[in-house]
Regions:
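Rossmann-fold NAD(P) dinucleotide-binding segment
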Residues: 62-74, 79-127
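NAD(P)+-binding Rossmann beta1-loop-alpha1 motif at the extreme N-terminus of oxidoreductases
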Residues: 2-74, 100, 105, 136-139
Length: 151
C-alpha cells in the first residue's frame, strides 16, 4: 500500500468503510483498487462479500472497526443511520481513540455532522466532513468528492 500520512504525522495503516450501497460501494471499491488495507461493514454482509473476496476484511461491529482502523469512513443513507452507527453501544464512538479520523460521507445535514463531530473530538479523534456529489456514476469514476473540511 502506498504510504499515506495522518494529520498528526503517523502513517495510515488501514481504512474502515461502513455503508456499501450505491455510492459507498463504488467509493470503497476505489480504495481497494488503490491498494488500501480495507475493512468493511454493511447491514447486509452479502453486499460486503465481493469486497472481502477482493482482500478487504470484515468488521463484526463499528466499534471493532474504530479500534482497528486509522480512518473510519461512513457513507450512510440518512442522519438517523449515521447517528445509530456512531452512537450505538457497539458504535464507532465506543471504539474511537486519540489520533483516529472519522470521515463522514453520508446523506445527512450540517447540524448532524457538527453534532457527531463534536462527539468524535471528545474522544481525541478528528472528524472530517467529506460531502459526495454526482451520485453513483461519478462515484464510480472517483470524481465525486467535494473539498473536505473539518467538522
Amino acid at each position: 500500500m502506498p504510504q499515506r500520512i495522518l494529520p498528526r504525522g503517523q502513517a495510515i495503516q488501514s481504512v474502515g468503510f461502513i455503508g456499501l450501497g450505491n455510492v459507498g460501494g463504488k467509493l470503497a471499491g476505489s480504495l481497494l483498487r488503490n491498494k488500501c488495507q480495507l475493512m468493511v461493514r454493511d447491514l447486509d454482509k452479502t453486499v460486503a462479500q465481493p469486497f472481502i473476496d477482493a482482500s478487504a476484511s470484515w468488521a463484526d461491529s463499528p466499534k471493532i472497526m474504530a479500534e482497528k482502523c486509522d480512518i473510519i469512513i461512513t457513507c450512510l443513507p440518512s442522519p438517523a443511520a449515521s447517528a445509530a452507527v456512531m452512537e450505538a453501544d457497539d458504535g464507532i464512538l465506543a471504539g474511537l481513540s486519540d489520533g483516529k479520523i472519522w470521515a463522514e460521507m453520508s446523506t445527512t445535514d450540517a447540524a448532524e455532522v457538527t453534532r457527531l463531530g463534536a462527539l468524535v473530538k471528545e474522544r481525541g479523534a478528528d472528524p472530517v466532513d467529506c460531502p459526495v456529489s454526482g451520485g453513483c456514476h461519478r462515484a464510480a469514476t472517483e470524481d465525486s468528492l467535494k473539498p473536505n473540511r473539518p467538522c
